[in-house]
Regions:
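Positively charged, low-complexity, intrinsically disordered RNA-binding extensions
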Residues: 92-148
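Compact, glycine-rich, soluble single-domain proteins
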Residues: 19-69, 82-110, 115
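Short beta-strand segments
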Residues: 6, 32, 76, 132, ...
């Protein structure tokens, strides 16, 4: 499972011209489900998202987790599994089949909602989304459960 975490001041998802999700200060997490990913990957990623320390203290050092009023926007993005090895056209053969990927994405969403007293919102799986972000920093962190 691959994720990209971005610290944001605001984020929103629009599908077919309609606003479907919106957050203020917090994290936007793009999620790519890879063939062979399991519930173990879901819990590992949830732990990383819940505990990542990318919010700064007074000395501008990243030492704090998401603040109590922080929000999370979880966005499915199979293109994180795209490979350009030997080609200029992305190859998505490592992306999980849509049905299984949606199942694992929904489990991650559920786990984060249960573990957080904060607001957790999501994009729309399998839909074309317009994602607007106000990235803070910029701070962008990549994580792959397989260490790639």
């Amino acid at each position: 499972m691959r994720i990209v975490i971005q610290r944001v001041l605001a984020g929103e998802v629009i599908v077919s011209g309609k606003l479907v999700s919106k957050i203020d200060n917090g994290l936007v997490v793009f999620v790519g489900i890879e063939k062979g990913d399991t519930e173990k990957d879901v819990f590992e990623v949830s732990r990383k998202i819940s505990n990542i320390r990318i919010f700064e203290n007074e000395a501008q050092r990243m030492t704090f987790k998401l603040p109590d009023n922080g929000e999370i926007l979880l966005i499915p993005q199979f293109t994180l599994l795209g490979s350009l090895k030997g080609t200029l056209r992305p190859d998505f053969t490592e992306a999980e089949e849509p049905e299984r990927a949606k199942e694992l994405f929904n489990l991650l969403l559920k786990v984060l909602k249960e573990d957080y007293s904060r607001i957790v919102r999501d994009g729309v799986f399998g839909e074309h989304m317009l994602v607007n972000l106000q990235i803070d920093g910029p701070v962008t962190i990549f994580y792959d459960t397989r260490g790639k």
